Amino acid sequence: MNSIAQTNQSEKQLSEKMQYFLRRYHVSRILRSANAYKLRGLPVLSIFIVAFSTIFAQRSFFMQIHLQPGVIPFAKDTLYRFMNSCHIHWRRFTTTLAATIIQSTIAPLTSADRVNVLILDDSVYHRARSKKVELLARLYDHAKKEFSYGFRMLTLCWSDGNTLLPVNHTLLSTENP
C-alpha cells in the first residue's frame, strides 16, 4: 500500500484554487488588455500559470523544472522572455487586476458610505550586501534614521479602512551613488 504524499495533495489544492482565481477574475482577458499576446508556441496563459504557481509553491522556476521534469512544457528561456518582454504592460496588468478584484469581490461586501482611499508609500528596499547592482543608491531611511544602500520602493495601495490591496509598485533610484 502506498501513501499519498502531503505535497501532492497541497499542490492539487493549490492548482484548483489558482484555476478558480484565474477564471473568476478573467486573468486571460486582463493579460490580453496588457498586450500579452502569443507570438508563437504556447499560449500566454499557460506560461503565466507556471510563473504564478512557482511563487505559491515557494520554489524557483529552476527547482520546479528539476522536481517535476516533463510537467512544464517549455524551457526557462521562454519564461524569462515572457517576464522581460518590453511589449507587455505589467503596470496596466496589475492595476486592472486590482480594480477587478475591488469591483467584483470587495465592493459588494462593504457599505456605500465607507470612504475608499489610495495610499502612497515610499519605503526603502534594502540591498545592504550588494555592491555592483545597477542604479544602487545610498538612501536615508527616515524610520530607522540611518543611511543604507538600496532602492526606494514606491507602492500604491487601495484601502477601505479594513482591507488593503496593493495596486502597483515601482523601484526608484538615482544615477548618483
What spans do the regions from the language model cover?
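Conserved, well-structured functional cores that handle cations and Mg-NTP chemistry
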Residues: 1-177
